[in-house]
Amino acid sequence: MEKNTIILAAGQGTRMKSKLYKVLHQVCGKAMVDHMLTQVEKTNMDHIVTIVGHGAEKVRELLGDRTEYAIQEQQLGTGHAVLQAEKILGDKDGMTMIVSGDTPLFTAKTFENLFEYHRQKGAAATILTARTENPFSYGRIVRNEVGVVSKIVEQKDATTEEAEIKEINTGVYCFDNQKLFAALHQVKNDNAQGEYYLPDVIGIMKDAGEIVAAYEMADFSESMGVNDRLALSKATKVMQRRINEEHMVNGVTIIDPENTYIDYGVEIGPDTIIEPGVQIQGNTKIGSSSVIGAHSKIVDSTIGNRVTVTSSQIESAIMHDDSNIGPHSHLRPQAEIGEFAHVGNYCEVKNAKLGARTKMGHLSYVGDADLGTDINIGCGVVFVNYDGMNKHHSTVGDYAFIGSNSNIVAPVTIADHSYVAAGSTITNDVNKFEMGIARGRQVNKEGYFKKLPVYDAALKAEEENNK
């Protein structure tokens, strides 16, 4: 039997107060509609149709050919939105599930259970329901004395007795595909908003004597919809807890899960330790037995095994096995740190490679350069790579030594086994076994201190200290 899904993603989302299309707002690094599509894909659909309207091109750009699309030109209600999929699904048999693109917390397991329950019941329609102690604002599921669904009643229309019902409509449905579109053509818009509502299909099917079932899901939190920034924050918190728990189950130590922020899709190996305040975002992979120190931020990067990151920021970079960085250093895009290499405190690396066992202890900048293995970079070294118009590249060979407070003015090549004396500004190549030294010769002027303004201040301080 064919399985289809329609994702409703045409709403404008005015309550978000945003220029960004509502379903494109992110929850843990992934757009809400992308979360939904990912879970739907896991249930092996024959057809997936996304209903788009406002912001259609941006949704298409994000989701690509993972789904088919139908356009709702006018916002005339959820029933009208589903009807736009008829030209794609109208001649199909089987089952069709309808979900919303602004409910990012649903799981594939819940959808699989819904399809199976619908099939077992032989129903024309199955409503996905949940129980909550605070059902206010949700439609209530009214059942008869034998547990069969009688109707869905909205909050504003509920009697006092009906308002006490804890079972609510999550807004997800599974239908017999042919009966769905037949019923949609009978939906009227004789309401205050002049819209065609999808839940009216349930009443039409009941009146026609069709079987209408309800499957109660286990976790109410999955059904959380996002209509404003407050709900977005709540959904993000639920998703973050889910992500962190999955990593911990898989062998990752997260010291403070409530204050650790890991995007959906991030990969972390076992025995890695994540300290409080860490943010791990985008397409990031972290190996095993690494330590990500407090308040570090890692974005779109690959971190190897046994790597230590101490309070540093890493973006679009690579750290190979057994390397370390920090505290308070920054790897910018296209930085690559070799095995056992060391980047200490207050350093920055951009579009540059540090080879294995190369050490860069403190207060240095390496940009647009290739550095070999076993190099020592002293304190305050700067690779001068920009002439005001263009970036230029430098190369440093294996076993070289770059003395403190040196400037390497690109483009230059510093060969294997060469030495740059501290305080030098290097503008020419340094060959193998050579020492490059480029600094003014020191001259000591006898008695000159007494001619300087600071001399009087120093005498006064000395007199005060000797009293």
Curated annotation (Swiss-Prot):
For this record, an example GO cellular component is: membrane
How does the cofactor attach, per the note? Binds 1 Mg(2+) ion per subunit.
Region annotation (N-acetyltransferase) maps to: 251-467
Q: Where is the active site?
A: H362 (proton acceptor)
**Per UniProt, which keywords does this protein have?**
Acyltransferase, Cell shape, Cell wall biogenesis/degradation, Cytoplasm, Magnesium, Metal-binding, Multifunctional enzyme, Nucleotidyltransferase, Peptidoglycan synthesis, Repeat, Transferase
Q: Which residues form the signal peptide?
A: none
Q: Where is this region: Linker?
A: 230-250
Picking any one GO molecular function of the record gives:
UDP-N-acetylglucosamine diphosphorylase activity
Q: Where in the cell is it found?
A: Cytoplasm
User: Which GO biological-process labels does this protein carry?
Assistant: cell morphogenesis; cell wall organization; lipid A biosynthetic process; peptidoglycan biosynthetic process; regulation of cell shape; UDP-N-acetylglucosamine biosynthetic process
Q: What does this protein do?
A: Catalyzes the last two sequential reactions in the de novo biosynthetic pathway for UDP-N-acetylglucosamine (UDP-GlcNAc). The C-terminal domain catalyzes the transfer of acetyl group from acetyl coenzyme A to glucosamine-1-phosphate (GlcN-1-P) to produce N-acetylglucosamine-1-phosphate (GlcNAc-1-P), which is converted into UDP-GlcNAc by the transfer of uridine 5-monophosphate (from uridine 5-triphosphate), a reaction catalyzed by the N-terminal domain.
**Self-association or partners: how does it assemble?**
Homotrimer.
Among HAMAP family, the record links this protein to: GlmU (MF_01631)
Q: What is this protein called?
A: Bifunctional protein GlmU
Q: Which organism is it from?
A: Pediococcus pentosaceus (strain ATCC 25745 / CCUG 21536 / LMG 10740 / 183-1w)
Q: Which gene name belongs to this protein?
A: glmU
